[in-house]
Curated annotation (Swiss-Prot):
Stated role: Catalyzes the oxidation of naphthalene dihydrodiol into 1,2-dihydroxynaphthalene.
Entry annotation: catalytic residues: 153
Organism (species): Pseudomonas putida
Pathway entry: Aromatic compound metabolism; naphthalene degradation
Protein's recorded name: 1,2-dihydroxy-1,2-dihydronaphthalene dehydrogenase
E.C. no: 1.3.1.29, 1.3.1.60
UniProt keywords, alphabetically: Aromatic hydrocarbons catabolism, NAD, Oxidoreductase, Plasmid
GO biological process, one term: catabolic process
Length: 259
């Protein structure tokens, strides 16, 4: 495959992940994608034909992450960037809920929002070291401020900040590690099955656009295509070569507080 850049993206079947696939393809990258079901696979196949390497599976399963990387290498020959993007929300789950509900939701949210990032990076790392590649994680405005979710979700996204700093330090100079903190973005982000929120989608919440407008100094709710540019910067070997341990916020000023 020559010198063309290769990126692998988890959570690639909807929302920001789907827009990342589109943006990196438009930028000339080869792309491999991990999606959670056949419906998402069919959507990608319809749009991109056979241009992508697609794996269907559970991002919490380490064997699935290893499969994603193996198939990426088998098809494209190398890996330049791994984007850990899969995530779920907690729909403002309160600490006052029954403990069993909190405990199971906490485990599910941290397994997907935190542990799956470790798993994917672990699987990708041997190949990234070969290419002096990079990792980009999806953090959140909730990594920096409250109000964008319940305590389980906010805690999981704060954990991503620690992961970025620790891994950037540990893996330098071979591999760069950074993150993007989107906020105020209307997507199909679902919730935890443990709390019964897995069939819900943020974009379907009544009044979600107006709620975000009220929380965002710039005064509008973003779409996925509005928040992907920092990922391209951080993945770039040219523009991003001196960036590591950095988290770029793209939230319309939401972390600043209400205007």
């Amino acid at each position: 495959m020559g010198n063309q850049q290769v990126v692998s993206i988890t959570g690639a079947g909807s929302g920001i992940g789907l827009e990342l696939v589109r943006s990196f393809k438009s930028a000339g990258y080869y792309v491999s994608a991990l999606v959670r079901n056949e419906e998402q696979e069919a959507l990608l196949c319809k749009e991109f034909k056979d241009a992508l390497e697609i794996v269907v599976g559970d991002v919490r399963d380490h064997a699935t992450n290893e499969k994603l990387i193996k198939q990426t290498i088998d098809r494209f020959g190398h890996l330049d960037c791994f984007i850990a993007n899969a995530g779920i929300w907690d729909y403002m789950l309160s600490i006052e809920e029954p403990w069993e509900k909190i405990s199971s939701s906490f485990d599910e949210i941290f397994d997907i929002n935190v542990k799956s990032y470790f798993s994917g990076i672990s699987a990708a790392l041997p190949e990234l070291k070969k290419t002096n590649g990079s990792v980009v994680m999806t953090a959140s405005v909730s990594s920096h401020a409250v109000g964008g979710g319940g305590s389980c979700y906010i805690a999981s996204k704060h954990a991503v900040l620690g992961m970025v700093k620790a891994l950037a330090y540990e893996l330098a100079p071979e591999v760069r590690v950074n993150a993007v903190s989107p906020g105020g973005t209307v997507t199909s982000l679902c919730g935890s099955a443990s709390a019964g929120f897995d069939k819900m989608h943020m974009k379907d919440m009544p009044g979600i656009d107006d709620m975000i407008k009220g929380l965002t100094p710039l005064g509008f709710a973003a779409k996925p295509e509005d928040v992907v540019a920092p990922y391209l910067l951080l993945a770039s070997r040219k523009q991003g070569k001196f960036i590591t341990g950095t988290v770029i916020s793209i939230d319309g000023g939401m972390a600043l507080g209400r205007k």
